[in-house]
Amino acid sequence: MGLKEYLFGFKGENMAAKYLVSQGFEILEKNFHSKFGEIDIIAKKDDVLHFVEVKSTSKDYETIYRVTQNKIYKIIKTINFYMLKYDFDLNYQIDIICIEQNKVKFIQNVSF
C-alpha cells in the first residue's frame, strides 16, 4: 500500500470515528492489532462494544462488497483475543462504516 492509499484510509477512519462520537459512542481504540488481524475502531455505547470495520472509496461503487466472509472471520478471531486480553464481559457486535464520496453509511450488527 502506498502513502496515498494509506492517507486516504486514515482520513476515512477519522471521519468514521468523528461520526461515531457524534452519535454518542465512546472510542476505546483505533487500529487494534493482534496476530489474527486488525480492527479499525473499537467503540462503546450503552454497555455494548462495537467492533467497527471502515471501508472508504472515492469511486462510485458499494464499499460493503469489500468486506468478505474471510475478513469477518479474522475480525471475530481478533474480537475474541481483545475480549480475553482486557477481560471484558459485555455484549458486542460487528458494525461496518462505509465512506462513499465523503458520505457515511453506518451498517450495524452485521453477520454472515
UniProtKB/Swiss-Prot annotation:
Q: What InterPro entries does this protein map onto?
A: Restrct_endonuc-II-like, tRNA_endonuc-like_dom_sf, UPF0102_YraN-like
Q: Name one GO molecular function term.
A: nucleic acid binding
Q: What is this protein called?
A: UPF0102 protein CFF8240_0294
What Gene3D superfamilies does this protein's entry cite?
Answer: 3.40.1350.10
Kindly name one Pfam family recorded for this protein: UPF0102
Q: Which domain of life is it from?
A: Bacteria
Its family remark reads: Belongs to the UPF0102 family.
Question: What does the organism's lineage look like at the top?
Answer: Bacteria, Pseudomonadati, Campylobacterota, Epsilonproteobacteria, Campylobacterales
